[in-house]
Amino acid sequence: MCMFINIGGGRSIDVIYIMECKEEKNYYNAAMRQINGDSLCLSTYQYLKRNEEWIGRYENFLKGKRSLPLLYDPFFKKIFNPVERRDRLSELVSCLLGQKVTVLEVFPNEDSQFLGVMIIMDMVVMMADGSIANIEIQKISYDFPAERISCYSADLVLRQYKMITGKNQGRKHEASMNGSSKPSYKDMRNVHTIILFEDSNKSLISDMDKALYFHVGKTRFNTGVKIELLQDFVLVSLDTFRKYRYSDIREGRTEITDYDYDSSQYNDELVSEKMKRDRLKFLSLFVAETPQEIDRLIEIFPDLESVRQDINEYLERPGEVLSMFSEALRILDRNTAELMVDRMKDEMEALKVQKDELKAQNEELKSSSEEKDAEIARLKKLLEEQNK
């Protein structure tokens, strides 16, 4: 916010702006004093300095030049804390799923065989109707997205089944939702896999229109039989959203388009206009990079003011936010390393196959050469006999 004070002669000075710049600089200086005076913070800071991009993000946040990277696990789970910010998290899940939901609980990642592997953020939540949703964010466009998504969704189904059969500690009271002593499959509810891709691979570029960014998937049968399977999928290409939609929203053009909401995929009676607008609001928040961008979004979506306040609170807690940055970097480093290992394994397997093929070709050539040598020897012998 800037305030111009006229001092005569048509001139003005931006007093508030100068004060804010000074305050931003003081946040950085105060943070550096705290870091240098704490051996643990200093060690964490040195770790972060090994990555030029991430130390830049941290310092620029303190200087008021960058916002927090909300699409990383430590930051997301603070801003969308399921206890302190349950309403905000429920709003997010509601607008992504296209139905009103209330988040009841968040499950730990370690309960899963698949979740938390090669991803930036994952959160498994249960809604008021008993259905389960997994929210995941991928920073890197990983290989085999269809296979990974299928595994994540299957894991959610298994989690819910274990709850119903009473295998999970603390959930035996949910052994049967219909009053029977024996769990029933009809107690199962939908599971929703929500994945936000920061860097979409080519499989997420629609042949219909490259600007389509919100992909909704369900299993349907060619005969039209009414068998509703449990697994639903929502895949959001944030880079596509930023490229083709975000600039319009920043200009105030927030009318809902077919790119934002495909009515054929939802029950319109369950989807409010607020949910549609919330979808634009949260996706815009996720791709915003600077405080100035967030300020502009607040003019369009005033209820983002509470998010800005939560973000700004971390300017007063540089040690805590430093730990969050270092944790996010460790997750990214681990995921990148695992991705590289997987790709190296694939390359080694491909080289092995190539080696085997070359070996087979060599054997064929050797066999062919031996046959030719034998034929030459036979012809020589025949020629010698004819010359006698």
Where are the regions a protein language model picked out?
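Elongated, amphipathic alpha-helical interaction scaffolds
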Residues: 2-388
